Amino acid sequence: MREAVAEGLGTIGAPAVDSVVRSLSSPERSDGSLAALERLSLVGRGDDVRRFAAQAVASALESYGLGSPIEPGGDERLHLLKDSLLARADRDAVIGLRAAALLGDRSAMSVALESLSVTDPAQRANALEVIESVGARDIVRPLLWMWDGATPRRSDPDWLQRLSRDPDDWIRACADLLIGPEEESSMTQTLDTLPLMQRVLFLRQVHLFAELPPPDLKPIAMVAEEHAFSDGETIAEQGDPGDAMHIIVSGDVSIVVKADGQERVIAVRSSGDVIGEMAVITSRPRMAGLVAAGPVRVLSIGRLQFESILRERPETSLGVIRVLCQRLAEPMDAGGPG
């Protein structure tokens, strides 16, 4: 959708430039606005784009300065806040660089900009050097320090209170999680439902979502429904439509196959494991049943919601592929047929 809108604005040409440049200041529109400007001539709005790029880089450095010195230890809440600040720094830095790239030789910068999406620091450093050499050196250079992994000293003793007033809803929620009463974070609490931020903390431990930035876990946590099952209760029947996948919050789940009138447990999954995702992805009936082996709590995500997540989050698709590869490799690991 974003690309289609950008293409449409690109065909309008110069008359669209003013409104697109103005929309850069809106956080929810800046990404799409940059995509449109990459197809347009700036026609006299270069100074505005330069100011926006400098502001984005300054915001990135501020978030990095707040997040980098945090030493989480074993506190999952501190890990969440630190990773969220660094993810915001990363996002703002890339936005600033995309804006800076509009001020120079765009064709020379295109490959470098693509390299900014990778996580390898060496590739990013090379991309920054290319962008710096082509133009906007004063904007780009401060980011070299950030992506070199330097850790600044913290000078503000009230940094956490400051973050609790941050304009970003997500950062405020992460800060409030630390300022408020400490909650059980092992996911074994006996509440009827997990609070939203506790769901996010749990999802960070699930390898299916390990590559997602923390803010991207919030919509997943919001659509997931919590269910509890008693010992021996069926979670899903073999042959049923794969209309939902489940993430085990606590307890064990037996994977059961029925054949020739006999039931056989082929695997047991536990907390943090994802079950039922293969039927959801393939749109085929479930190849095995899911039975609670003792008290079990799960977070369930419906097929439509999961497909939407895969479309919007390519990193999640990669996680799914890894899970499927592991599932396919298990018979070989057990000495069975490949």
Task: State where each predicted segment sits.
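Short inter-helical turns and helix N-cap capping residues of alpha-solenoid HEAT/ARM repeat scaffolds
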Residues: 1, 25-29, 89, 119-121, ...
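Structural detector for internal amphipathic alpha-helices that build alpha-solenoid repeat scaffolds
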Residues: 1-12, 19-23, 31-43, 65-72, ...
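Amphipathic alpha-helical scaffolding segments comprising HEAT/armadillo-like alpha-solenoid repeats
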Residues: 12-25, 43-59, 75-80, 105-116, ...
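C-terminal accessory/binding modules appended to enzymatic or scaffolding proteins
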Residues: 85-109, 126, 153-181, 199-204, ...
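Regulatory nucleotide-sensing modules
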Residues: 197-261, 265, 275
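A small-molecule sensor/coupling module
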Residues: 198-199, 216-219, 280, 285-287, ...
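Long, acidic (Asp/Glu-rich), low-complexity accessory segments flanking structured domains
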Residues: 271-272
